[in-house]
């Protein structure tokens, strides 16, 4: 399912227009992204948790030259599924 299909499903199930459903879906995504950008986690009980994880600096290799390079530490968004979501998928 892509974003357009998600908006269509939300519109059908809530009797909203596709435009309104699209605004709701986009707003939810924006709020999650803004919270993560501020360093907060988003906990949706039964669904899962969105959080920012830090990846430590590490050594790597340039595959073309074999030269060892330093890879800087980074922050990356992560999602961990909740129990209800895991059970629904089984």
Curated annotation (Swiss-Prot):
GO biological process terms held by the UniProt record: chromosome condensation
Residues that bear Phosphothreonine: 4
Keyword Lyase recorded: no
Superkingdom in the source lineage: Bacteria
Keywords attached to this entry: DNA condensation, DNA-binding, Phosphoprotein
Pfam family, one: Bac_DNA_binding
InterPro entries assigned to the protein according to its UniProt record, in alphabetical order: Hist_DNA-bd (IPR000119), Histone-like_DNA-bd_CS (IPR020816), IHF-like_DNA-bd_dom_sf (IPR010992)
Keyword Phosphoprotein appears in the UniProt entry: yes
A GO molecular function held by the record: structural constituent of chromatin
One GO term describing the cellular component: cytosol
Oligomer status and interactors: Homodimer.
Family, similarity comment: Belongs to the bacterial histone-like protein family.
Function, as annotated: Histone-like DNA-binding protein which is capable of wrapping DNA to stabilize it, and thus to prevent its denaturation under extreme environmental conditions.
PANTHER family associated with the record: DNA-BINDING PROTEIN HU, DNA-BINDING PROTEIN HU-BETA
Name of the featured protein: DNA-binding protein HU-1
Organism: Halalkalibacterium halodurans (strain ATCC BAA-125 / DSM 18197 / FERM 7344 / JCM 9153 / C-125) (Bacillus halodurans)
Gene for this chain: hup2
């Amino acid at each position: 399912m892509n974003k357009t299909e998600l908006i269509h499903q939300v519109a059908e199930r809530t009797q909203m227009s596709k435009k309104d459903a699209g605004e709701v879906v986009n707003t939810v995504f924006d709020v999650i992204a803004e919270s993560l950008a501020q360093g907060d986690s988003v906990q949706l009980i039964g669904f899962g948790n969105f959080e920012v994880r830090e990846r430590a600096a590490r050594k790597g290799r340039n595959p073309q030259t074999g030269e060892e390079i330093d890879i800087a530490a980074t922050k990356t968004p992560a999602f961990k599924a909740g129990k209800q979501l895991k059970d629904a998928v089984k």
